[in-house]
Amino acid sequence: TITLADEENKNALGQSLTAGLFESLTSANEDPDVRVITLTHSGTVFCAGANLKERSAGTGAPDMGSIGFDKALSLIQTGPKPVVARITGAAMGGGVGLAAAADISIATENAKFGFTEVRLGVAPAVISVVCLPKMRRGEAMEAFLRGNRFTGKEAAELGIISRAVPEKDIDAAVQEVINDLLRGGPMALGAAKRLVNEIPRMTQEDAFPWAADFSAELFASDEAAEGMEAFLQRR
């Protein structure tokens, strides 16, 4: 489990928190004992977005990307292990990006989300890379331009997160997802992530031969042999 734990700054994306997040993701992806990565938070705020204190003091980089936030988002999406986000508090700006980047994101129905950047004189640039593919154009345009807050239930309707549940059910819902993921083979889970990320970028002409070769590699793996043998033996 990776926990955003800078409650004093509402888990805002400063240099330390962002670097720590990237390092934790890297370590978890490299640890053979880790099967699923859970991203959660301490306190009442999931992530307040950019650390404005650092920006105003001149200690923060002018672009989130230069302090590794883009790398963290990319690693969440392209890393071989599934990332499940558990969100029970506010997610603003970059916090929405973290929720959108996760493979499966579950929030409480009353959690607050918002693309509030325009009200600070900027725009949701880095997080647009992970948010826009999940949203319809008209809804994205309105959310980006108006900067209003919306609930976890509405975030699910927009496609930003997987689903929203009552607050009392959040832990059970997250655990149910984790239990399902643990039933999958580690290599198979990574392969499934890769398919979802890469196939939509290809033309059908390119996708079919690529997928056929990829499938052949998977079926030839030791993990597949073990999995199919277990299935046939009803293990």
Tell what function each PLM region has.
Residues A19, D33, H41-I76, A91, ...:
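Glycine- (often His-adjacent) and acidic-residue-rich active-site loop
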